[in-house]
Each structure stands twice: as structure tokens, then as C-alpha cells.
Amino acid sequence: MNDELKLKNNLKEVRTEKKLSQTQLAETIGVSRNTISSIETGQFNPTAKLALILCIALDKKFEELFYF
């Protein structure tokens, strides 16, 4: 049995609410569009630093973007 917690997110919903493309958000925070896509689909969990950068860029609290 796998007891590892999987971090989930509302990144796509928040990003589209702010009318940003994956490319625009990626360029704003200095990562690739593929990184944004991978986070949105749950293929990649961001580091604490990247999660904080996303929160700042999108003007959201951590718990508004990420949950378990």
C-alpha cells in the first residue's frame, strides 16, 4: 500500500480565471510551459519555492492553489 500523500492543485482553474496561458504564466515565473502543464496535470509536484512563486504570481494563498 502506498501511504504517500499526493499534492493536488487548482492551478489550471486559477490560471484561466486570470486569463493567462500556460506560456504567459511560465514566462512570468521563469519556467517552461511544460513545467506548468506537468504541475496542472499532477505529473510533477512543484518544490516549495516554485509553489510559493506561483502563489505570488497568481496572488493566491497556498491553500487556494494546492491541497491533499
Name each region found by the language model:
Residues 20-35:
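Short alpha-helical DNA-recognition segment
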